[in-house]
């Protein structure tokens, strides 16, 4: 079973899906129709992408009459933030070790 950050990376790897998610982050809640109007794909494609985003926990839907509104769930990015922080710490440590080695080589 894939871990949380693998699911998020896989979900956000698609440029169209990532653009939809970014738009929801920047502009707030949107209907499928509003998202489709600015997307370069059909309404069924937008709906499919929203389904994948929802399954990954990145968006939430809210039904109002015949319309479905979607909003970004930024808390779902926590596993990516944690992973990125771990990797940043790992590489910073490696760069510090390399810097120490280069200083010793110059002496």
Model region roles, listed by residue range:
Residues 17, 46-49, 91:
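Generic structural signal for conserved hydrophobic packing positions in ordered secondary structure
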Residues 2-44, 64-82:
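N-terminal helix-turn-helix DNA-binding core of bacterial DNA-binding proteins
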Residues 72-103:
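Conserved segment of winged-helix/HTH DNA-binding domains
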Residues 3, 103-107:
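Generic C-terminal helix-cap and adjacent flexible tail
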Residues 37, 48, 54-55:
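Alpha-helical residues within the helix-turn-helix
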């Amino acid at each position: 079973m894939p871990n949380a950050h693998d699911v998020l990376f896989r979900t956000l790897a698609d440029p169209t899906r990532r653009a939809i998610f970014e738009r929801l982050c920047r502009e707030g809640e949107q209907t499928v129709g509003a998202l489709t109007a600015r997307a370069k794909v059909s309404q069924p494609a937008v709906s499919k992408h929203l389904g994948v985003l929802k399954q990954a926990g990145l968006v939430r839907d809210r039904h109002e009459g015949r319309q479905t509104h979607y909003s970004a769930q930024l808390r779902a990015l926590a596993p990516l933030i944690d992973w990125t922080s771990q990797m940043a710490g790992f590489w910073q440590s490696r760069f510090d070790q390399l810097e120490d080695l280069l200083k010793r080589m110059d002496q």
